[in-house]
Amino acid sequence: MSEVKSDIQIAREAKMQPINDILAKINVPDESSAFSPMGRHIAKINLEYLDTLKDKPNGKLVLVTAITPTPAGEGKTTTSVGLNDGLNKIGKKSIVCLREPSLGPSFGMKGGAAGGGYAQVVPMEQINLHFTGDFHAITSAHNLLSALIDNHIYWGNKLDIDVRRIVWKRVMDMNDRSLRSININLGGVANGFPREDGFDITVASEIMAIFCLSNDLEDLEKRIGNITIAYTRDKKPVYAKDLKAQGPMTVLLKDAIRPNVTQTLENNPAIIHGGPFANIAHGCNSVIATKTGLKLADYVVTEAGFGADLGAEKFLDIKCRKSDLKPSCVVIVATIRALKMHGGVAKDDLKTENVEALKKGLVNLQRHVENVKKFGLPVAVAVNHFIKDTENEVKALIEFCDTIGVKASLCTHWANGGEGTKELASHVAELCEKNEDKFKFLYESKTPLFKKIETIAKEIYRADEVIADTKIRDQLKSFEDAGYGDFPICIAKTQYSFSTDPSLKGAPTGHSLPIREIKLSSGAEFIVVICGAVMTMPGLPRVPAADSIKLNKDGEIEGLF
């Protein structure tokens, strides 16, 4: 048996084409007015060029989501890349639009996030590390606002900011639990007024959300100005624009907001831009990137983070609501290993055939299919094939999908690239072409905020009730009174269960949704509802991926998979 190559080995063997050749495939002219090269294999598309595309018709939008995942993930990015390559193989002009990886999980639990096997975007090492510096710009803009807040207080606090009611934390793009709650301005009067503060991870930042939901620079600046940063001693809101912060923050983001273009291993175009997490944020790449893809190709394949209860719900109820995007089809990625886990199999036994456990775990897939159909969208299932999957297990999964009225396609893109997704690609194209445009939101914008939360909890998570104390309910009422009642809901919870208890696998019922905290994102224009024990600053696992990452004697990176 031949040695199985690692993702990084495969990526290094890629025969990448110059980025201007990749852009030529989607008719972007080889002119400085259209794009700015960032080396030989990456470019940023200029906003002025994007303005010239406004009158072009849109292509078909395909959303890739997944069943409730294992900690290793079920391969949404890999499947998105593979499906994009498959669509191009069957003669469809397609672009994949992905999120940028965060350094947190790259050095933490999951490792890199540029696909896997023969379904990757490249140059993989650059994409997984600093890429084009977008996350640095977002982090810098966010922390500039933090610095301006404390500076304003130091120089007299003309706005009468109550230091006990500052709601704007600092951020960094790393998993570091020690920074969740800190004291700042210590060391004497020269350093300011001591107060409590903390850090979130950059991908949970409201700046990241605004960056990904803005339509252009003007919209970006307006939204930044509308960020609620604190409250006065009279409990009146203080906004970023009160500190004149929107101008310099937009300056820091003016280049980052241009979409990044790179390529797949099969030299098909990929747009990689923005990267909020889906468990603690809205989990979708930028609106600008998605709209760019729709103007340049007949099909755009994009993914939303974690399971369909998180990323897909937020993509449909937040991103689509804010941008007038409408998917033509949704692909749910399922793996045999995750379904066996939902059927009660222990992690160490997932590689052993167990058809009965698989059948028991299929309730998880069934619920995700039912949930997506509530949005009026056609569904396809992509079975992301692993080497240890058996014929009996695959057969049981595909036959089950037939009984619930969806077609499942066995996908071998990890081993075979686009050739391994041609069946899925053909089915997706068929669903897109006959889409009857029945897309609808789960709730109306005018629905009261608490009712919106209840709707998501009961319709998507299948909870019996939402638990919220008087303080939470009063906060929601105050948001409505302040004019934010039309905002959609962004629920932050564990990605490992429909419930807030990560140990409840399968399709649990009879549980409740306890609200721990709510946050107003007045710039991003949604309400964050934090449930259970989920953290907006993750920690590293006992054995982080960083333990295996190093430079070898040839100066090459090892361990970044």
From Swiss-Prot:
GO molecular function annotations of the record: ATP binding; formate-tetrahydrofolate ligase activity
Gene (name only): fhs
Keywords, comma-separated and alphabetical: ATP-binding, Ligase, Nucleotide-binding, One-carbon metabolism
Gene3D superfamilies cross-referenced by the UniProt entry: Domain 2, N(10)-formyltetrahydrofolate synthetase, Formyltetrahydrofolate synthetase, domain 3, P-loop containing nucleotide triphosphate hydrolases
Binding locations of ATP: 70-77
Entry-linked InterPro entries: Formate_THF_ligase, Formate_THF_ligase_CS, P-loop_NTPase
Official protein name in the record: Formate--tetrahydrofolate ligase
Entries under NCBIfam families matching the protein: PRK13505.1
Pathway(s) per entry: One-carbon metabolism; tetrahydrofolate interconversion
GO biological process per UniProt: tetrahydrofolate interconversion
PROSITE patterns in the record: FTHFS_1, FTHFS_2
Catalysed reaction, written as an equation: (6S)-5,6,7,8-tetrahydrofolate + formate + ATP = (6R)-10-formyltetrahydrofolate + ADP + phosphate
Family affiliation: Belongs to the formate--tetrahydrofolate ligase family.
Enzyme Commission designation: 6.3.4.3
Pfam family, one: FTHFS
